[in-house]
């Protein structure tokens, strides 16, 4: 059965509390999950989905999948098409599972879907076999509604009788067809006609409730949505959501309100007389929550039951509500968890029934016609089990039953709930719309504790079905694509007792002696006293006395007191972190004695940790071997404290040695008794005395008050003052006068620059060279310059008085008194009485005009404007202006307020200012003049606006910019000021307190009040919006909306607004007339990649109509946003060739939104700037190409979006002239004659070749028939071996390399430890540069320029091209979609270059001469890994195994690598070798006591060859890298208990003849059949040691020759096992001597003709391996093989090559065939076939390599389109497969045809696939390392790259050169 899901028993990493703990998940990719059911006994999980039902094991392993759809159907067909021919067109329709119930009595699953009007299937629980699917009667159709969560059902078992199904469902307006609630029979026979029939039905009553059609005619949208159903006692309950008909208006377009209700019926009531429904809800902090989302029935824990005052076996209902009553489909995220007791609900219902039967009120069921029918007084006794009568029913509740709020949430959106009781606690689990699981402990209605939140599925909502496993140890969560199994507790995540017991998880307790958080049942010793803690106060408490020790005091005995510990008589050890453990002494009192660490351990513990090191003293239980408790312990180190105050102020007993300037814990260490200080009062210290102020350049001493200053002793240096400023240090000798005073000697100090008037410096007093005296924290030393930043007298005198700066009049400079000549008369200081600065100057005044009434605040700026505001006198234009002290800035700025001018028409004038008296030196006036004006206004525009205000008014007049303050008043309200100039004031009109009316306007400019009689502003009725058309847009917005309303002309700047997920957007509107305006819809920010197809609804949608609040959010709006349209480019290259006037088809998606109504998107298509007429469909636009020719750009405009699709190449057909036609005819005739002559000559030549070919072919046929029997026997034997291998493979699997190793071996052949495999360790600036370089690589223009520039360099070698290609692909692996676009562009450029250079098109991609070709190889490497593992890897591995086993059946020369059996002539032994097969019994190296392993070897095998065969057999199925190597093992021949002989290739028994030394073989040692051997670790013999130097030297000489770039495998892969030692004159040989030796030359080996006997061996080997070669070729050249589909990458790349050929008008099929062959088989498959070690963890020897090369060559020949002419010079491998290649060629051609016929892959689908591939392997390589390697080429070709970036227009536009230069600069800064 085809799998429809991707089953991931994923170890999905969960964030949050789960950390990295895994949980299981079942994930689907091609369907949507809807419902979940868990078997209450077996724990099996059943999942309902769209078109599927799954059965899963409890661990979520898929057991069965049952297909339920799609089905041919039409929603309008009733009865469904399965019963009667339907008049409506049928189409495949998805079957959405809406109900999934387990019928335990009948051992079956009830699965109800949406097709055929809602039929159900009965599925056998064991295997989901369909037992029945009733669909013949109307009772079988439950409802055709499509919503998956609108139905709920309950099965009620009835003992001996059939079970009943109570089912509630939404009916989607079809109440005449479906009851909304019914009770139906569940017959044991699924084919029974009574299945699903109503439990009771006669002509008057039945077991059903229907929504009256009159209700639907009034409220077409009315429906009842069933959320949850359950049984309690003898009642059946349903929680529902239904339209609130009392709040919802009859207008269908109006806003809809919903209410939640609980429905109750008696389970045994077949007439539904007991139907009662009550509104329910919850309130919290005054906010109502009325939209029920989910519910769960449970028992309360004992603590909750006690808090509620109900029995512990009472049923309670945990319920989730969303806030408000709107947006049922997309409810608000503000949600609440509430609790109802069933007893309370039943009490409300009982009281309601009793009141109705007393005749009080009406039936009050709003959606029934008889809702206003009065209750009939019927005296009778009504108790809690009353099930109704024929009267007073159905009944509705009058008041809302309020739940108890437990937990509110406003972010995640709670969506589902489940609960159960654990011990005394109620534990509630909540799924959220953000994809997380919340865990809540509820111990009371005011005691709900959210103790854990676990992310499960990022961004995907958890659906309603939240279920427990039968043992309540796991919980199953359902989302649209995933079922997740999470443990109900994750106690082990808590690492301490406090974290464990403080988490709030009731499942968790602390297992004391095992120091772990777990359930009590998982704790060994939990039953012992204090063995298991469940309360925080019961955690182990540890107290240590003393709790600190000096680092100089080792081995102190510590007393440890323990509380809350179990019996410790088994013993306890103490340990200080890494220090050694010491056994503790257990005292009778229960206390422990532990020694502190030794001196050596203390040094290790405290080194580098400063003054204190807090270490954990840990106690280890000898009973459990676990460290179960501990306490912090402090080791203090006084010696690191460098000052007296820090030393004696330490909390530890530290003492300061004054004369040694050291801190110690040992007071006796001080040299002098009087030098010891043990309290802060005795410390030498500079006393606080204010800031130390030092003028620059003044030679002066500095005296400081101090205390306890030590007197330097003999040999100690005196005091010094050390000053550090601006990085410079100045040391000044100082004198200690006594213990309380010190003076720095005469010195001057300075700092550079005048940017600052003062600067703080680092000042300290030291003695004896470097012993600083402590300073108080508040001590500051300031160095200052009087003249810096104080250029005027006023600024000088307002300097800090402490600086004692004054103004030197003669010098015009701010200086100290001592620096000013004649200071008594020439130096001014603020302390001097009457000091004032002369020559004030005004530089600016503002404003320059004002009303004569005064009140204008004039700001005057200048210098020397007085030192106090009271000493400044001002007149402005002759009028007094009063200074405002609060705004005065000494000497710099004065703000004054004008008095009224009493002159009728006052003239303008300057500002006059006096400082003190008005003598000439202290008086000034401004150059600017101030003028008096009379402001007036005479017009307001607009003259009318809405009563809510918000209109932008422009009041026009003259001199309106006068004064400093302006107030506009409309009637009695202030108009909000915006701006003004001389001719106009702009303000925003206020709200009219009188509503629509006329209002006067007045102005107040400072103290001038201005009015304009007769000028009136009219407040009108507020505008309203009554209708929108259309009520939808696209995500981008900017589509036209026609708005109907009233009074729209009064709106000045209307805008339309939308608010979505908290983000508000707006767009413009244009008013057309008073009742209509045209708007452009605002776009919304989606926040996720794809919008829903059914559209997105904004949280708010409305209009900004000035300040009209009622239009901001239209309550009745159902505005919808649909996905934006998107278009495909015109072609891969963006150019499409068409004829003039032909149709142009533009393909796209979402071109017609799925919106109701006739409105459509308005598309404009511009071709060459000219619009064309359009025809629009769902997926394409059709327009006519214009009449112009040439290249015309194509652009599509829609809704503010612009799509540039490419270029149309419009080419007209031109008729040929008569001379041209005659010339063509003549030329054609000549050409025909030339072709005829060539063909005649060619025919003669080919006839000779054909005769030679036929002769050779005949020889081959004869030889092949002669060896057919041998081939058959050899194949049968090999097939037996391979069958054994494949059987073993089923157990151990093929040794595939991991993705990372595989990719590195292909991308960087021969480099196993490439830098990209490890993270780069680099300085921060280089790392930053590389990250910027990585960003630059995401610029297509840069990468293309970069690569093309490198390729243009003559020194850029082939190896460099491959390296750059590989590094680029690694660097871009996280963006494979982008890398693919780059690759396509590079390939397109390569094709263009190939054609321009007149090269034959078939040469394209043949060799790796460009970066693009290697990138293509790497691209396939990345994307075909999965195909290799799942499909092609197996036949390739079997071929490798077959070759290896077949080769090893015959002799193989260890020196030359030649073999008896070979596909390669070059590796064929040309002599007769006598050999016998031996079976050795090998002792397993790792377990000599296990069974011996029989191994077949040849007696002519060298010892190393024998070891390899033994290792292959003993470690069968083990990857090569994980098993021992032959060179690391010795072969030991055991001839008895005592006789053991080490066999070696060379030893003292080795035979030497002349100068030839023969390798030892098994025959040399006379090893017999059945011998016992063993592989033992290598032993170095004297002989080996003597020869190791010679052998190593010889090996190193051959290594460079034998290692090739095609294989990253070790030297053993390519080289013979033993290398001849020619330097010593002795030549090694094994089976045959080297062919180059004169005495043994067999003839001319250069000849390609093979003698008959050797060709026979080649043919025999070829025939034996034929099936394995065929299997591999068939797999590779099949579009669907072994259940695997064709990889997307192959189809996508082949289509790209076809498109390139189409664009370049290459119609030759051979060229296209060759391109594809060069692209995939040549570039990828040949590489993999020749080097299987790229894919598998194997060892490839030289003979296997040679045979694989023959297979790879055959593979290449099969892909070629040219005919292979065989002759006497043809290679043997071409002769070998001459008969097979035509067949293989047909496979290749069929393969290419099949791919071409397949549906194209869209760029979007390919991008999605590539993004997923990037995600899967995002962390496999170090991108930073790849960028670092790639940057080498930037460095090497720096200038060329920068020049190329300058030349490229696109690079210049994006300033790519500057960006690269920035990177180069960053890197260079580190060098």
Swiss-Prot record:
In terms of InterPro entries, this protein maps to:
Ig-like_fold, Ig_E-set, IPT_dom, Plexin, Plexin_cytoplasmic_RasGAP_dom, Plexin_RBD, Plexin_repeat, PSI
Q: Which residues lie on this side of the membrane: Cytoplasmic?
A: 1242-1871
Gene behind this protein: PLXNA3
Gene3D superfamilies assigned: GTPase Activation - p120gap, domain 1, Immunoglobulins, Phosphatidylinositol 3-kinase Catalytic Subunit, Chain A, domain 1, YVTN repeat-like/Quinoprotein amine dehydrogenase
Keyword check for Transmembrane, yes or no: yes
Q: Where, subcellularly, is it found?
A: Cell membrane
Q: Where is the Sema domain?
A: 20-488
Locate the Phosphoserine modifications and list their residues. Answer: 1596
Q: What is its main location?
A: membrane
What the entry lists under SMART domains is as follows: IPT, PSI, Sema
* PROSITE patterns linked: SEMA (PS51004)
Membrane topology label: Single-pass type I membrane protein
Organism the protein comes from: Homo sapiens
Q: What is this protein called?
A: Plexin-A3
Alphabetically sorted, this entry's keywords are: Cell membrane, Disulfide bond, Glycoprotein, Membrane, Phosphoprotein, Receptor, Repeat, Signal, Transmembrane, Transmembrane helix
Residues with attached carbohydrate: 59, 548, 637, 738, 746, 1009, 1036, 1073, 1115, 1162
Function field = Coreceptor for SEMA3A and SEMA3F. Necessary for signaling by class 3 semaphorins and subsequent remodeling of the cytoskeleton. Plays a role in axon guidance in the developing nervous system. Regulates the migration of sympathetic neurons, but not of neural crest precursors. Required for normal dendrite spine morphology in pyramidal neurons. May play a role in regulating semaphorin-mediated programmed cell death in the developing nervous system. Class 3 semaphorins bind to a complex composed of a neuropilin and a plexin.
A biological-process GO annotation = axon guidance
SUBUNIT field:
Interacts with CBFA2T3/MTG16.
Q: Which cysteines are joined by disulfide bonds?
A: 77-86, 112-120, 266-387, 282-338, 356-375, 491-508, 497-539, 500-517, 511-523, 574-594
């Amino acid at each position: 059965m085809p799998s429809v899901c991707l089953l991931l028993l994923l170890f999905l990493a969960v964030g949050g509390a789960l950390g990295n703990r895994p949980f299981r998940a079942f994930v689907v990719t091609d369907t949507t999950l809807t419902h979940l059911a868990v078997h209450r006994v077996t724990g099996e999980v059943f999942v309902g989905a769209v078109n599927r039902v799954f059965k899963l094991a409890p661990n979520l392993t898929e057991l069965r999948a049952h297909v339920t759809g799609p089905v041919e159907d039409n929603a309008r067909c009733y009865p469904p098409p399965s019963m009667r021919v339907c008049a409506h067109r049928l189409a495949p329709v998805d079957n959405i599972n809406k109900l999934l119930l387990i019928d335990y009595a009948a051992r079956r699953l009830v699965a109800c879907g949406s097709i055929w009007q809602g039929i159900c299937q009965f599925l056998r629980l064991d295997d989901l076999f369909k037992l029945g699917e009733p669909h013949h009667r109307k009772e079988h159709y439950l409802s055709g509604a499509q919503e998956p969560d609108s139905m709920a059902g309950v099965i009620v078992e009835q003992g001996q009788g059939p079970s009943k199904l109570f089912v509630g469902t939404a009916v989607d307006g079809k109440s005449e067809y479906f009851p909304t609630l019914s009770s139906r029979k569940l017959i044991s026979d699924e084919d029974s006609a009574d299945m699903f029939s109503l439990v009771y039905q006669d002509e008057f009553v039945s077991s059903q409730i229907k929504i009256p059609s009159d209700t639907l005619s009034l409220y077409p949208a009315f429906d009842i949505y069933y959320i949850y159903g359950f049984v309690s006692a003898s009642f059946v309950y349903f929680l529902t959501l239904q339209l609130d008909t009392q709040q919802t208006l009859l207008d269908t377009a109006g806003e809809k309100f919903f209410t939640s209700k609980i429905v109750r019926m008696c389970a045994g009531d077949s007439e539904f007389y007991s139907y009662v429904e009550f509104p329910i809800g919850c309130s919290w902090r005054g906010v109502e929550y009325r939209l029920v989302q989910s519910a769960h029935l449970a028992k309360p824990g004992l603590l909750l039951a006690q808090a509620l005052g109900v029995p512990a076996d009472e049923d309670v209902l945990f319920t989730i509500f969303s806030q408000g009553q709107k947006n049922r489909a997309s409810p608000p995220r503000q949600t609440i968890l509430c609790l109802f007791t069933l007893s309370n609900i039943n009490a409300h219902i009982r009281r309601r029934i009793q009141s109705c039967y007393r005749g009080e009120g009406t039936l009050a069921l709003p959606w029934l016609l008889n809702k206003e029918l009065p209750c009939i007084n019927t005296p009778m006794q009504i108790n809690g089990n009353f099930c109704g009568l024929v009267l007073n029913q159905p009944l509705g509740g009058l008041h809302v039953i309020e739940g108890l709020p437990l937990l509110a949430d406003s972010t995640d959106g709670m969506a589902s709930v489940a609960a159960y009781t654990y011990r005394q606690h109620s534990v509630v689990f909540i799924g959220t719309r953000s994809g997380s699981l919340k865990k809540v402990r509820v111990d009371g209605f005011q005691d709900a504790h959210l103790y854990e939140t676990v992310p499960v599925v990022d961004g995907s909502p958890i659906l309603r079905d939240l279920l427990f496993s039968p043992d309540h140890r796991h919980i199953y969560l359902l989302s649209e694509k995933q079922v997740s199994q999470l443990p109900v507790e994750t106690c082990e995540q808590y690492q301490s007792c406090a974290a464990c017991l403080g988490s709030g998880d009731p499942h968790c307790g602390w297992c004391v002696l095992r120091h772990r958080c777990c359930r009590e049942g998982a704790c060994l010793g939990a039953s012992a006293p204090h063995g298991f803690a469940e309360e925080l106060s019961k955690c182990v408490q540890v107290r240590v006395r003393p709790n600190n020790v000096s680092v100089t005091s080792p081995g102190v005995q510590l007393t440890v007191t323990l509380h809350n510990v179990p019996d410790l008589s088994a013993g306890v050890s103490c340990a200080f972190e890494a220090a050694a453990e010491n056994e503790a002494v257990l005292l009778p009192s229960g206390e422990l004695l532990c020694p502190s660490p030794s001196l050596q351990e203390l040094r290790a513990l405290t080194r580098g940790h400063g003054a204190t090191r807090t270490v954990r003293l840990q106690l280890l239980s000898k009973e459990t071997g676990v460290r179960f408790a501990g306490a912090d312990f402090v080791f203090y180190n006084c010696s690191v404290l460098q000052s007296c105050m820090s030393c004696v102020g330490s909390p530890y007993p530290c003492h300061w040695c004054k004369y040694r300037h050291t801190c110690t814990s040992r007071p006796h260490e001080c040299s002098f008794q009087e030098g010891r200080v043990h309290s802060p009062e005795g410390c030498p210290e500079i006393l606080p005395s204010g800031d130390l102020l030092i003028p620059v350049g003044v030679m002066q001493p500095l005296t400081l008050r101090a205390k306890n200053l030590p007197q330097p002793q003999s040999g100690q240096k005196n005091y010094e003052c050390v000053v550090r400023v601006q990085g410079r240090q100045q040391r000044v000798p100082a004198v200690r006068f006594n213990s309380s005073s010190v003076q720095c000697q005469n010195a001057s100090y300075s700092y550079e620059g005048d940017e600052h008037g003062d600067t703080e410096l680092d000042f300290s007093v030291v003695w004896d060279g470097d012993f600083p005296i402590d300073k108080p924290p508040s001590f500051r030393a300031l160095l200052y310059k009087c003249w810096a930043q104080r250029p005027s007298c006023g600024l000088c005198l307002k300097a800090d008085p402490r600086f004692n700066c004054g103004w030197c009049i003669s010098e015009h400079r701010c200086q100290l008194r001592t620096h000013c000549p004649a200071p008594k008369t020439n130096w001014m200081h603020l302390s001097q009485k009457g000091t004032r600065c002369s020559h004030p100057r005004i530089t600016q005044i503002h404003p320059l005009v004002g009303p004569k009434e005064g009140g204008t605040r004039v700001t005057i700026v200048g210098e020397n404007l007085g030192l106090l505001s009271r000493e400044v006198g001002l007149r402005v234009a002759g009028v007094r202006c009063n200074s405002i002290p609060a705004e005065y800035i000494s000497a710099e700025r004065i703000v004054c307020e004008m008095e009224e001018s009493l002159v009728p028409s006052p003239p303008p004038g300057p500002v006059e200012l006096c400082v003190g008296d008005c003598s000439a030196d202290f008086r000034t006036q401004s150059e600017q003049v101030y003028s008096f004006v009379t402001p007036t206004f005479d017009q307001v525009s607009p003259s009318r606006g809405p009563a809510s205000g918000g209109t932008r008014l422009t009041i026009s007049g003259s001199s309106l910019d006068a004064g400093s303050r302006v107030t506009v008043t409309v009637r009695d309200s202030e108009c909000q000021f915006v701006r003004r100039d001389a001719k106009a004031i702009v303000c925003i009109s206020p709200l009219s307190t009188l509503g629509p009316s006329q209002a006067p306007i007045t102005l107040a400019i400072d103290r001038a009040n201005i009015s304009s009689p007769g000028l009136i502003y009219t407040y009108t009725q507020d505008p309203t919006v009554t209708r929108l058309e259309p009520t939808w847009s696209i995500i981008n917005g900017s589509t036209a909306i026609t708005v109907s309303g009233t009074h729209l002309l009064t709106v000045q700047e209307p805008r339309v607004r939308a608010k979505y997920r908290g983000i508000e957007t707006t767009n413009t509107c244009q008013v057309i007339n008073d009742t209509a305006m045209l708007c452009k819809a605002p776009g919304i920010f989606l926040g996720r990649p794809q919008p829903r197809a059914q559209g997105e609804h904004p949280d708010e949608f409305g209009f900004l109509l000035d300040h009209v609040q009622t239009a901001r959010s239209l309550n009745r709006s159902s505005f919808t946003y649909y996905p934006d349209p998107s278009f495909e480019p015109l072609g891969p290259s963006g150019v499409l060739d068409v004829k003039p006037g032909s149709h142009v088809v533009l393909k796209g998606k979402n071109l017609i939104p799925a919106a109701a109504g006739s409105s459509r998107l308005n598309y404009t298509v511009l071709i060459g700037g000219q619009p064309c007429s359009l025809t629009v469909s769902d997926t394409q636009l059709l327009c006519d190409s214009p009449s112009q020719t040439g290249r015309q750009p194509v652009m599509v405009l829609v809704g503010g979006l612009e799509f540039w699709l490419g270029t149309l190449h419009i080419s007209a057909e031109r008729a040929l002239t008569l001379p041209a036609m005659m010339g063509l005819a003549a030329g054609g005739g000549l050409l025909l004659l030339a072709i005829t002559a060539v063909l005649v000559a060619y025919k003669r030549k080919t006839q000779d070749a054909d005769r030679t070919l036929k002769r050779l072919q005949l020889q081959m046929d004869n030889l092949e028939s002669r060896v057919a029997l041998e081939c058959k026997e050899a194949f049968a034997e090999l097939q037996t071996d391979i069958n054994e291998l494949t059987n073993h493979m089923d157990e151990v699997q093929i040794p595939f390399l991991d993705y990372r190793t595989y990719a590195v071996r292909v991308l960087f052949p021969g480099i196993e430890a490439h830098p990209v495999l490890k993270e780069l360790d680099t300085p921060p600036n280089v790392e930053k540069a590389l990250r910027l370089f990585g960003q630059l690589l995401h610029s297509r223009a840069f990468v293309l320029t970069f690569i093309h520039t490198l390729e243009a360099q003559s020194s850029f070698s082939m190896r460099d091209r491959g390296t750059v290609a590989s590094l680029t692909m690694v660097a871009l692996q996280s963006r494979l979609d982008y890398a693919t676009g780059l690759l396509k562009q590079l390939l397109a450029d390569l094709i263009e270059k190939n054609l321009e250079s007149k090269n034959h098109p078939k040469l394209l991609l043949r060799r790796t001469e460009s970066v693009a070709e290697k990138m293509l190889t790497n691209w396939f490497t990345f994307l075909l890994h999965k195909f290799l593992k799942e499909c092609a890897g197996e036949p390739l591995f079997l071929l490798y195994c077959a070759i290896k086993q077949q080769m090893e059946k015959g002799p193989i020369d260890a020196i030359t690598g030649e073999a008896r059996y070979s596909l390669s002539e070059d590796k064929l032994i040309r002599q007769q070798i006598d050999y016998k097969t031996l079976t050795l019994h090998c002792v397993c190296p790792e377990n000599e006591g296990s069974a011996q392993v029989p191994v077949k070897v040849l007696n002519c095998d060298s010892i190393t060859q024998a070891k390899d065969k033994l290792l292959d057999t003993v470690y069968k199925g083990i990857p090569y890298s994980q098993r021992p190597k032959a060179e690391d093992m010795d072969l030991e021949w055991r001839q008895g208990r005592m006789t053991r002989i080490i066999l070696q290739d060379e030893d003292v028994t080795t035979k030497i003849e002349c100068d030839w030394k023969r390798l030892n073989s098994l025959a040399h040692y006379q090893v017999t059949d059945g011998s016992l051997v063993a592989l033992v670790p290598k032993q170095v013999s004297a002989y080996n040691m003597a020869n190791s130097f010679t052998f190593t030297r010889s090996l190193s000489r051959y290594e460079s020759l034998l290692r090739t770039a095609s294989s990253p495998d070790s030297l053993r892969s390519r080289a013979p096992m033993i290398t001849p030692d020619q330097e010593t004159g002795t030549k090694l040989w094994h089976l045959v001597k080297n062919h180059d030796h004169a005495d043994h030359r067999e003839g001319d080996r250069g000849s390609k003709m093979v003698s008959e006997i050797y060709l026979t061996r080649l043919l025999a080997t070829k025939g034996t391996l034929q099936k394995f070669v065929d299997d591999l070729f068939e797999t590779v050249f099949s579009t669907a093989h072994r259940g695997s589909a064709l990889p997307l990458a192959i189809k996508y790349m082949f289509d790209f090559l076809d498109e390139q050929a189409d664009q370049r008008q290459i119609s030759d099929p051979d060229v296209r065939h060759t391109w594809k062959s060069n692209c995939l088989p040549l570039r990828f498959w040949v590489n993999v076939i020749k080097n299987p070690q790229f894919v598998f963890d194997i060892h490839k020897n030289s003979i296997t390599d040679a045979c694989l090369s023959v297979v790879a060559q055959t593979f290449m020949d099969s892909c070629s389109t040219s005919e292979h002419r065989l002759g006497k010079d043809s290679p043997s491998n071409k002769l070998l497969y001459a008969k097979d290649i035509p067949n293989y060629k047909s496979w290749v051609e069929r393969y290419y045809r099949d791919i071409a016929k397949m549906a194209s892959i869209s760029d979007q689908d390919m991008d999605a696939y590539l993004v997923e591939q990037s995600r899967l392997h995002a962390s496999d390589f170090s991108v930073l390392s790849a960028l670092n390697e790639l940057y080498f080429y930037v460095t090497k070709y720096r200038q060329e790259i920068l020049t190329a970036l300058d030349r490229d227009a696109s690079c210049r536009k994006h300033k790519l050169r500057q960006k690269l230069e920035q990177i180069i600069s960053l890197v260079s800064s580190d060098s």
